[in-house]
Amino acid sequence: MRPGTAVVLALAWLVAFNLRSGFIGLGPALPALTVDLGLSFAQAGFLVAVPTLMMGLMAVPGGALVDRWGPARVITAGLALVAVGGGLRAIAPEFVLLLALTFLFGAGIGVSQPSLPRLMRSRFPLRLGVTTGVYASGLVTGSIIAASLTGPILDRIGEPAAWRLPLLLWGMLAGIALIIWTVVMRPWCAEPAAVGSRVPQKQTMVAGWTPWRDRQAWISASLFAAQGIVYYLLVAWLPAIYGEAGSSATATAALFAVFNAATLPAILLFPIWSDRLRRRRPPALAAATLFLLGVLGLLMLPLADPWRWLWPALAGSGVSGVFAMSLVLPADIAPPGRTGAAAGMVLAIGYAASALGPVIAGVVRDVTGSFDATLLLLPAIGGLMIALSALAPERSPTQVGD
């Protein structure tokens, strides 16, 4: 007996949560880790960069694997890598082993992510927006909880080696998720990948189709890349931007919290709205417009009361809404049996571009001596997101399952 709708959605949320918690949880632990192992800042930077790199590099092979073996099996393998690689980081005695385990951990994330769009299309082909919003909220929740709890855990222990405990905790949670996933999804793992599709097996692989030659796939990938650039740029530098504008440390923390808090409702609401409309373009356009308004306010009136609280809320909800809509699109554009390939291509290009956001902003800050040029870059990319949203695939979510 295959698991029901609520169970599959709960499991997808749990998987998504564990694809982010161990990744984001490293950031607050990095200063203690650097001191304890005697690392250079460059070495510490590699530990943060590798998971993002692997999310991009492993997305394409992950998409191919899920189209071949099905989402249940690939997620099982990916979660195993996340649990083992992520958890064993906690006992690594030196940098080389820690880096190798981080590669393993990142590979698990990269392989698993294309499986989630395929899972949603195979089980919920008429409700892709709602179901994508559910698992995407798991990504955001995992990030928020890991970022919020890791610091207090370190403070509570108060020792140089305290960084090991939160990494072990996130690894153990991934292991628990793996056990739950394997037990509940075992009947599905035993089926051929195409079982459950609403089309015959011979129709599930469309000969000659590849996302790399598909215009809609490139538009979707470009939209995902644009939102990724500005999101990771703001996550890295928004506190510094506020500080340079004259904000106090307390106010800056509160404004940054508003930005992060605004992402969670948006990541659910925009995909749900798209299902109700049976269209993707209007919600994507609305989200991109909210982001543009937010960064224009940040550029012109960053600390003016009461508007300063509105700008990060608009920017956070807007970029999160575009992120969620970008995750829906691969399942819309791909022919039956090729959702994994489409998702892999979109994620690979998107995460490769996302890694450039913080770097570009840092280089511009070094060259110009201020964040003014970076603030001009944000609305430019916001305008690009609006243009790409206007071109986004406008396909009613009525396609067959995968």
Predicted regions and their residues:
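Cytoplasmic helix-loop-helix junction between adjacent transmembrane helices
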Residues: 101-138
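Conserved MFS/SLC helix-loop-helix module at the cytosolic interface between two early adjacent transmembrane helices
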Residues: 57-96
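Extracytoplasmic gate region of multi-pass secondary transporters
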Residues: 26-27, 215-267, 271
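Helix-loop-helix hairpin linking two adjacent transmembrane segments in secondary transporters
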Residues: 126-130, 134-189
